[in-house]
């Protein structure tokens, strides 16, 4: 199906007139949403079906799972892919953007450095289902004089627009971004991340990179206690196991963009920018 055929197909099968074809746009740089980098709304392991409650300062987040578990940090790649494509379109054409995004699994797999096996197509379906079903309840959206509790999903909806030859040749997929994520993108509450993020295979390492990127920012370094880092990752492992994994990461020191050091005596982690 060529580009013009895709557009004709979508117009015939779309009730909402405005849509964005992600395949048409090359990602100039990858972007991540700030709130989800600051707080652990995505699970670090698959199949986590427990209701999770996270408290940090004045922030309370309750995460309710689907039958298949909470959306995990690898499911978040769909988010990152979507907002990166939209931001690239804004940068290039200063275009109005749509919450309705259409893409082929192939473009998603290539962009996020995934393999294109039959299993990958099935896992993409499951990831979309978890994103739709996971519910977040939080008071995070508040100002100094006003606090507001909200409940929302991680995507509003998804559907497969076309399918050929079973699982191995799925056609275009449509997702509708939630309003709050759409607003975050329009208000530039996003941060540029390394394209090597997708090469990070351990979920805990991905989460630690997010925290380093969010807090280090343009500073030369960022320090945090091990216990605070443990809390902010959303890890459900024992603290001693978290420290074991942390020491492994420190030895390898292979996070994109950042060096990581561990002061055992003070129990402090230091992230510093690579130059």
UniProtKB/Swiss-Prot annotation:
Residues 98-198 form the BRCT domain. InterPro entries: BRCT_dom (IPR001357), Replication_initiator_prot_A (IPR018777). It holds the Pfam family RPA. GO terms for biological process: plasmid maintenance. Keywords: Plasmid, Plasmid copy control. Signal peptide: none annotated. It comes from the Bacteria. This is Putative replication protein. It comes from Wigglesworthia glossinidia brevipalpis.
């Amino acid at each position: 199906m060529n580009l013009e055929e895709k557009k004709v197909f979508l117009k015939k099968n779309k009730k909402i007139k405005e849509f964005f074809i992600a395949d048409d746009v090359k990602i100039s740089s990858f972007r991540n949403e700030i709130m989800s980098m600051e707080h652990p709304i995505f699970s670090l392991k698959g199949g986590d079906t427990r209701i999770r409650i996270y408290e940090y300062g004045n922030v309370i987040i309750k995460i309710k799972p689907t039958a298949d578990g909470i959306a995990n940090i690898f499911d978040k790649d769909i988010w990152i892919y979507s907002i990166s494509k939209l931001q690239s379109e804004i940068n290039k054409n200063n275009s109005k953007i749509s919450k309705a995004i259409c893409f082929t699994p192939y473009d998603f797999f290539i962009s996020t450095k995934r393999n294109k096996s039959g299993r990958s197509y099935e896992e993409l379906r499951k990831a979309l289902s978890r994103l739709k079903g996971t519910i977040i309840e939080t008071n995070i959206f508040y100002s100094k004089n006003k606090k507001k509790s909200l409940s929302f999903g991680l995507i509003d909806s998804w559907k497969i627009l076309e399918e050929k030859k079973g699982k191995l040749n799925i056609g275009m997929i449509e997702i509708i971004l939630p309003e709050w994520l759409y607003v975050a993108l329009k208000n530039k509450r996003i941060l540029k991340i390394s394209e090597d993020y997708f090469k990070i295979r351990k979920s805990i390492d991905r989460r630690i990179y997010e925290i380093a990127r969010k807090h280090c920012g343009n500073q030369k370094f960022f320090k945090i206690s091990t216990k605070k880092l443990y809390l902010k990752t959303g890890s459900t492992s024992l603290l001693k196991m978290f420290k074991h994994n942390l020491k492994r990461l420190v030895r390898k020191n292979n996070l994109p963009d950042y060096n990581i050091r561990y002061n055992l005596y003070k129990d402090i982690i230091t992230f510093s920018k690579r130059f």
